[in-house]
């Protein structure tokens, strides 16, 4: 699940992605909701198209799918977010209530509560470290002292 509207996840190889704020490289028909990849020639169309993104005050795209993923997750990681905007601000709480281990990864400490672990440092280093820990040990223990990052339990 991503809140980003760019295509960086897709370019990095993510294939099972839910873009809850839409995708900038897609357009949506205002009346029918049809979504097309952009660029798409709509010059001859008499109908109105708009970017396939969520604007303030609009309902999040695919929220039902997001909730299914949150309640089925064994690990929930929030990476590079303030965690202050609803509904994403409740995702860690929802995942944790469903039994997931929750991890916050941010460049600076946020003071967020509700996470089992808070990793402080660059996501480019900490996400691979987290994935490696889960794959090699089957659990999340602590951050690597070799990189100078540490995992702090709430």
Residue ranges and their predicted role:
Residues 1-154:
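Conserved catalytic alpha/beta core of Sir2/sirtuin-type deacylases, generalized to analogous enzyme cores
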């Amino acid at each position: 699940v991503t809140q980003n509207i760019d295509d960086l996840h897709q370019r990095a190889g993510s294939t099972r992605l839910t873009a809850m704020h839409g995708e900038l490289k897609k357009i949506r028909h205002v009346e029918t909701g049809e979504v097309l990849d952009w660029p798409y020639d709509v010059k001859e169309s008499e109908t109105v198209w708009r970017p396939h993104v969520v604007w303030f005050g609009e309902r999040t795209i695919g929220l039902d799918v997001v909730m299914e993923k949150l309640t089925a997750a064994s690990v929930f990681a929030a990476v590079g977010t303030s965690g202050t905007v609803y509904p994403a601000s409740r995702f860690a709480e929802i995942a944790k209530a469903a039994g997931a281990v929750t991890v916050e990864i941010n460049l600076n400490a946020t003071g967020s509560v509700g996470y089992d672990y808070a990793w402080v440092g660059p996501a480019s280093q900490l996400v691979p470290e987290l994935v490696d820990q889960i794959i090699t040990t089957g659990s999340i223990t602590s951050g690597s002292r070799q990189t100078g990052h540490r995992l702090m339990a709430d």
